Amino acid sequence: MVAWLWKVLMGVGLFALTHAAFSAAQHRSHARLTEKKYEPLPADIVLQTLLAFALTCYGVVHTAGDFRDRDATSELKDMTFDTLRNRPSFYVFHRSGYRLFQRPDSTHSSNLSASSSDLPLKF
């Protein structure tokens, strides 16, 4: 089919989905005014919501077009072994618990030592 037809179909689906949401909000407001607490949504609103969602999904899938094939061998053929296994997000330059493992005779004093016991932590 023509590409613009899928976009129109998606637009109609989004409009119908918006209308169904507005109808559900109006129904809830009406139920609150009439003090009916547990009244379910009417079947026409539920049906309109489901059909509008299906129509929107169908339009989105066809508007997006075909998937592009990804060939990993073409991207990986120029990489060396060192480049392939390089993960900079795993580099650690500063540990957050470095004060737990320092020696008791170190010159740096911790702010927590005044409130904690005088025994050093050893692991």
Curated annotation (Swiss-Prot):
High expression levels in brain and kidney with lower levels in heart, colon and liver. Very low levels in intestine. In kidney, highest levels in distal convoluted tubule. Its main location: Golgi. The keyword Phosphoprotein does not apply. Residues 102-123 are annotated as: Disordered. The keyword Magnesium applies. Residues 107-117 have a biased composition (Low complexity). GO terms for cellular component: early endosome; early endosome membrane; Golgi apparatus; Golgi membrane; plasma membrane. Residues 23-40 are lumenal. It is a multi-pass membrane protein. GO terms for biological process: cobalt ion transport; copper ion transport; magnesium ion transport; manganese ion transport; monoatomic cation transport; nickel cation transport. It comes from the Eukaryota. Pfam families: MMgT (PF10270). One of its GO terms (molecular function) is inorganic cation transmembrane transporter activity. The chain crosses the membrane at residues 2-22, 41-61. Induction: Up-regulated by low extracellular Mg(2+). It is found in: Golgi apparatus membrane; Early endosome membrane. InterPro entries: MMgT (IPR018937). Keywords: Endosome, Golgi apparatus, Magnesium, Membrane, Transmembrane, Transmembrane helix, Transport. Coiled coil: none annotated. Residues 1, 62-123 are cytoplasmic. Belongs to the membrane magnesium transporter (TC 1.A.67) family. Mediates Mg(2+) transport. This is Membrane magnesium transporter 2. The lineage of its organism: Eukaryota, Metazoa, Chordata, Craniata, Vertebrata. The gene is Mmgt2.
